[in-house]
Amino acid sequence: MELPIAPIGRIIKDAGAERVSDDARITLAKILEEMGRDIASEAIKLARHAGRKTIKAEDIELAVRRFKK
């Protein structure tokens, strides 16, 4: 796991939780990492399709929209 756990706990608390277990933080971190990899992979495909090597914010945004469907 690469994402730090403390910020994950803050995200959950910002959503309204009073307390957050370590298991919950670790589980959300794993899920977010997997989602991040999937979104990045789709963004890479979009950039390559556009003839670019550089991933732009718009590639990420479009990739996220595709996953929301």
From Swiss-Prot:
Keywords: Chromosome, Cytoplasm, DNA-binding. GO terms for molecular function: double-stranded DNA binding; protein heterodimerization activity; protein homodimerization activity. Signal peptide: none annotated. SUPFAM superfamilies: Histone-fold. It is found in: Cytoplasm; Chromosome. Changing residue 53 to E/T: Loss of formation of nucleosome-like structures with DNA. Its main location: cytoplasm. Residues 19-21, 53-56 are annotated as: Interaction with DNA. It comes from the Archaea. The record marks 13 as: Interaction with DNA. The keyword Cytoplasm applies. Changing residue 56 to E/T: Loss of formation of nucleosome-like structures with DNA. GO terms for biological process: DNA topological change; protein homooligomerization. It holds the Pfam family CBFD_NFYB_HMF. Induction: Expression is relatively low during exponential growth, and is higher during the stationary phase. One of its GO terms (cellular component) is chromosome. InterPro entries: Archaeal_histone_HMF, CBFA_NFYB_domain, Histone-fold, HmfB-like. CDD domains: HFD_archaea_histone-like (cd22909). The keyword Protein transport does not apply. Changing residue 10 to S: Loss of formation of nucleosome-like structures with DNA. Belongs to the archaeal histone HMF family. Binds and compacts DNA (95 to 150 base pairs) to form nucleosome-like structures that contain positive DNA supercoils. Increases the resistance of DNA to thermal denaturation in vitro. Homodimer and heterodimer of HmfA and HmfB. Heterodimers may be formed primarily when cells enter stationary growth. Dimers then assemble into higher oligomers, with the DNA wrapped around the protein core. Higher order oligomerization of these structures can give rise to long, superhelical fibers (in vitro). This is DNA-binding protein HMf-2. It comes from Methanothermus fervidus. The lineage of its organism: Archaea, Methanobacteriati, Methanobacteriota, Methanomada group, Methanobacteria. The gene is hmfB.
